[in-house]
Amino acid sequence: MSFKDLRSFISHLEECGELKRVSYPVDPYLEMTEIADRVLRAGGPALLFEQPKGHSMPVLANLFGTPKRVAMALGKEDPLALRDVGELLAFLKEPEPPRGFKDAIAKIPMFKQALNMPPKTVSRAPCQEVVMTGDDVDLTKLPIQHCWPGDVAPLVTWGLTITKGPRQKRQNLGIYRQQLLGKNKLIMRWLSHRGGALDFRDFQEKHPGENYPVVVALGSDPVTILGAVTPVPDSMSEYAFAGLLRGERTEVVKALSCDLEVPATSEIILEGYIAPGEMAEEGPYGDHTGYYNETDSFPVFTVTHISHRKDAIYHSTYTGRPPDEPAMLGVALNEVFVPILRKQYPEIVDFYLPPEGCSYRMAVISIRKQYPGHAKRVMMGAWSFLRQFMYTKFIVVVDEDVNCRDWQDVIWAITTRMDPTRDTVMIDNTPIDYLDFASPVAGLGSKMGLDATNKWEGETNREWGTPIVMDEAVKRRVDDIWDELGIEQSPTL
């Protein structure tokens, strides 16, 4: 099932018991966060706060609060089915040449589908049903969530920031948090390596002294939202990728104030510009690490136009110590990454980003080891292959007999198959998440790789241990007589 807009997805979730309407008045200042956090930690539904205090616009929270709902947003019922999305991305990133005539014929539909999904431009769109300009622009009328007691101001969290640079043929979609600064001002917190920041830098070089047009879309259809956080090939737009997943071209409409194209069915659109040199101190804010981050200076986004649908819905989230919504997204998108990594490194059996590792700061990889030093090659490959893993601080590599998603198994492998000196890889002065205050320099720190695989000749001079395994016939015999033993419960094996 595909969803043309956020409202159709909300209706589907409600029918499936995956969304709860909250009619009791709830304050966007702290209360929504506490409620959403309790519900998410219990594996509960998405929440639609129908009466946010002080505002007439309802607030949608916890939309992607479980891996199941992430899968549902992409038209799947099971998170494991998201590997199909990963297979598609792996193909788009590196299409295999046909192995023969029959294979070429078989691949035609996939190539044709990929080429036929550019966005569809429409002249009128729901996101422009209500338009405000000039003095009518007032961001404080939006029920922007103030998430934590130490946050400096309300924070826009789920906005799709749309930019275009002079070096790119396509638009870029990115999700960057935005601090409310005034009735028509937001702080655009994009890190220097992110697409929006790179577009802005290129624009400044080519058009010095000119305002840079920017648009932010809130409440877009779920596939377009998730397209902005998946590893889409650089040559493909997020709109085209969303169309591929949806099986229908993404409808876009020209912005009111510039040539950027925005998702036509979005709930709210903020249009404006970033003036050269206009910066402001951003933060502190509670973040996905579970800590308040440092303050720093970022560009100011001046909003000149606000447009929205009639009876618009404001889409929001919070970030905090895992589990939070970004962590749940990470668990689901983990399945997307597996086929992409396997395409480049077929020896990879499984890949896991534990949510308690703040989505991406730790990875565990199981491999079919083929030669001495193999684990180190896989570490280096994972760190460098996808931009999403450039901030991964710790990588543990285990053999295929170890379940990389089971900490008991992983810790057993680390403590029995590793020598701390021989099997630990340390790399200094690498890119690190700006929010990682544990690094000695902002944005620059070290990485650690742990080779927890069985060691081969050349890696050790010792006779290697043989794992203890019970005889299968004995296990079957005990299974057969278990009920006769009078033992109430069989341990999980």
Swiss-Prot record:
EC number: 4.1.1.98
GO cellular component: cytosol; plasma membrane
SUPFAM superfamilies (UniProt xref): FMN-binding split barrel (SSF50475), UbiD C-terminal domain-like (SSF143968)
Reactions it catalyzes: a 4-hydroxy-3-(all-trans-polyprenyl)benzoate + H(+) = a 2-(all-trans-polyprenyl)phenol + CO2
Sequence positions that bind prenylated FMN: 175-177, 189-191, 194-195
Principal subcellular localisation of the protein: membrane
Family matches, as Pfam families: UbiD, UbiD_C, UbiD_N
Keyword Transferase attributed: no
Co-factor remark: Binds 1 prenylated FMN per subunit.
Keywords, ordered alphabetically: Cell membrane, Decarboxylase, Flavoprotein, FMN, Lyase, Manganese, Membrane, Metal-binding, Ubiquinone biosynthesis
One GO process term, biological-process aspect: ubiquinone biosynthetic process
Residues at the active site: 287
Binding site for Mn(2+): 172, 238
GO molecular function: 3-octaprenyl-4-hydroxybenzoate carboxy-lyase activity; metal ion binding
Necessary cofactors: prenylated FMN; Mn(2+)
Membrane topology: Peripheral membrane protein
Compartments where found: Cell membrane
Oligomeric form and interacting partners: Homohexamer.
HAMAP family per UniProt: UbiD (MF_01636)
NCBIfam families reported for this sequence: PRK10922.1, UbiD family decarboxylase
Function description: Catalyzes the decarboxylation of 3-octaprenyl-4-hydroxy benzoate to 2-octaprenylphenol, an intermediate step in ubiquinone biosynthesis.
Family membership: Belongs to the UbiD family.
Name of this protein: 3-octaprenyl-4-hydroxybenzoate carboxy-lyase
Gene: ubiD
